[in-house]
Amino acid sequence: WIIDLKSQKVLFHTLVAHGKNTGEEFANNFSNVSGSLKSSLGFFVTGTTYQGSNGLSLYLDGMERGTNHNARSRYIVMHGADYVSEEFIDENGRLGRSFGCPAVSRELEEEIIYTLAEGTCLFSYFPDSKYLSDSRLLDTEGLFALNQRL
């Protein structure tokens, strides 16, 4: 989900691939360690765009020490990927997986990346009890109430 909090509108509700060691079909195991090939949880701020080995990419700076602060040095960036599509799921039974990056479809990569570039807050969520108790940026009581409604 990509939500414009100012206008309170959903901009995108689309597929996103996670790191290959984060889980098979669903993400459930996260890391802040280089070489883990796992995605990270928590709050990020988007940086600039660049052309990398995966094409158009977006730098992500992790804002939570111990949870995702190594994102930039781990090269955790948002990028497009051919393995993020309904067709890939039909052929393989699930999305492909990245080396830890949030990867979006080639069809939407430009629109999503340029929408989020340069100073957008990005939040990667999973109901991980350690993250929820350690995060200094979350209102965990409010989040707990949200989880109860979902």
Located regions from the model:
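Cell wall/extracellular polymer interaction/catalysis modules
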Residues: W1-F99, R106-T120, S124-L150
